Amino acid sequence: MKPLVERINIAEIDEDLLTYDLNVVRCYKLIGNDVFLKSVDQGEEFFRDIHAFLNGLDDSLICTFVFKRINQNEPIVSRARQYLSKDKTIETLLFDDSNRAIEKGSMATDIYLFVQKSKKRKKTFFNDMAFAGLFEKEPEALALEREVLDQFDVKLSAMPQVKFQKMSKDQIYSYCYQSLNLEAPQKTNEQLFFKEYSLRDQLIKKSVNHHETYVQVGDHFVGSLSMEWLPVNAKGQLMHDLYYKNPNAQTAILTIEKASPEVVDELQSKKSLYQTFNLSDDADNTDTISNSSRTNDLQMAQEALNEGSEKLFISSFKVLCYSDQREDLKSVMSFTKNLLNTIDYAQFISDDFCHLDNFMSQLPGHPVHSIEQWVLSSHLAMFCPLYQPYQGTPEHPQFLFKNHWNELIPLSIRYGEADLNANHSMVVAPTGSGKSFFINHLIKTMRMTAPDDYVTVIDKGNSYKKICKVLKGDYYDIDFKPEYAMSPFPTKSDIFEGKNINKDQLIYIRQLVTLLIQDVNLKELSNAQERLIEKGILALYESVDSDTIPIITTFIECFSKVEATDEDDQKFIKTAIKNLGIYSDPDSPFSVLLNQPKQIELNNRFVVFEIGNLAKYPKLRNIYFFIIYNLVSLRMSDKERQQDIIYDEVEDILTDPTCASVVRRQYLGARKFGNRICCISQNIEHFTKEGLEDIPSNADIKYILKLKPESISCLPDIGFNENEISYIESSLQARRDIFIKYGDHAVVAKLEPSDLEKELYSTDFETFQKYEDLYSANDIENPLEIIQNNIPKKTPPKEVVTKGFSL
């Protein structure tokens, strides 16, 4: 017997009769559908009539009624079950709109009643108020089918209380499109590869009426390949081969849906597993090695689900190919299919995903030809390179991939799992592991998926100069220059609530003054000394108006007047004022930066602070870190926008106890403002020191790149289990893999940058020399074009490569 896919025929629509796969379909629209549901008695009589009607039909005829329950009329549904269940050949099922409410243990308002009389139930989509009749047996002649359907019309018209009307060709089209989920990508600035490409009624009609297996969009022809089986070991090679060896295979669509508990139970109980993956009616048609591989995959899935280390998903993978010529399209699809079928026994077939299968799958009682696979979460993540957009909704997630000449597309990093307490994150990325490419990509993702939110980066390695230029951000390369002068003291209007100072701001300024006055002879301060500093701060702000930016000189004047009767306190004040002199003396270079009535205005929503130039002055670097931290904290109170704060190369910051306490406090308190904190370090040890436990415990998202051997032993300290550690140690590849742990889940993503991404994200010495003019220029109209022109020329680039950065 031939495989199922070879038996699929092109649909023919003739007036109100539709034939498909040797079946004849006639569709009806229910008229006056609110009449019989107005009362329990009318509903009871109607279902009794249906019961009698179905029992009088030919056994080969499949009848499907789909009704929408109105006003939560529970007695009607109960009576329907009572009467329809008397005949064992009739099955009654209740579904909600999305066919998922039962899985969640709740019921939606809109519920459908599905009644089917047949020997074999078929998977079905449900829509409002419609009727369809199908034959399962192969007809001897079309005339016979018409005759039987005409007799059916007579019986149907004799039913009391309710009327059915034959659905015309246009009505059938409209009905079938009610459930198609063909929305464009959401919350991204990218467009599909054809501006006019949308699977709407007119495209489908044109393709079906002309018996074509592709969609014609303008001057282009689009065909589709579907994966019959998703191999576990395909990983990123599938994407790589698809896009780099065959650029004419322009787009691939991966739809993902979390498997229901029933599907998981079926997999764990080992029922019908082989049959699910055996895609032909004749087992001999399937390659023996492939069968063995599938069996191993299933056993692996069962073990992972039993351990609870994986989640099960249902996925469907399509590849769309396009060409200007019809014959060329056939060649492209043939070449692509042969290429993909060589990857770990992957099996692709040419299908009609673009029109026919999607259309016909909407008919009640008809089998769904969209091929779905069971796949574990980690294997699914290996399938996805990082340049991808999110499409759809949390209930219907989709990923749409583009090839390496298309615009850069973001990766969704805001995981929708309900068990995440906060979206704070941490990254462990040793030198040479691919950190610069990954973090640059995350930053671009943040800006493109939420352009109205704030993104603030504090760095010490000049890793983000180019991305800041391209995304029109503000870049502050802090040095001993007047333009980077920042007073440690905020304006009074920013930190006072009425007549009282904000308590958090008072603590911040006190900690900063403590940092300014500390030296080898003045390390630990007593509570009394800290209180003296707070009195000096309050006196400072009493002496200035609301819009004045206080400076260190003014603070010294106010601090010297603080009453201190104790001799030790008087000595402390004198020592503190003496230590502040290095910042207030006009001849000191530090006064140029810290003793000026200036503040950096953070008007741009994307800001990068580079403090690497202050590496020779660790105390000054920490002071600037404090000031920048407070500027960023003041933006937290903006209730209309969220904020991503990234601390890169934090090992020096976390070494200083005062600075480390600031980062720790942000991880604990930023969530209530809708802020997300991300710390990046080369070593796990920087996150496991005493007093820093709150960082890994509150970072619900952890990104691990290829680690050095000595760091593996620290993974349990930040919440990794034995299975995860084993994979990170043995299987994670440098400059390619990113192990992502979010909540109790873990996946592996592939770092596969395009040529433009490589040029944009690179941070080596040659790159800095190449783009020196770009860095020094204040305003460049199109910096991305300059970067694109420096890409090593392999093949002529397409114009679309720059579109992804339109904010």
PLM segments and residue spans:
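Conserved lysine of the Walker
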Residues: 435
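Walker A (P-loop) phosphate-binding loop of P-loop NTPases
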Residues: 432
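Extended, folded cores of ATP/NTP-driven motor/assembly subunits in large transport
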Residues: 1-385
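Post-Walker A helix-loop "phosphate-sensing" segment adjacent to the P-loop in P-loop NTPases
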Residues: 445-456, 471
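P-loop NTPase motor domains
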Residues: 33, 40-59, 261-262, 345, ...
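Hydrophobic anchor at the beta1->P-loop junction of P-loop NTPases
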Residues: 427
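Hydrophobic positions on the alpha1 helix immediately C-terminal to the Walker A/P-loop
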Residues: 438
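A short helix-turn-beta junction within AAA+ P-loop NTPase domains corresponding to the substrate/partner-engaging
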Residues: 474-476, 692-704
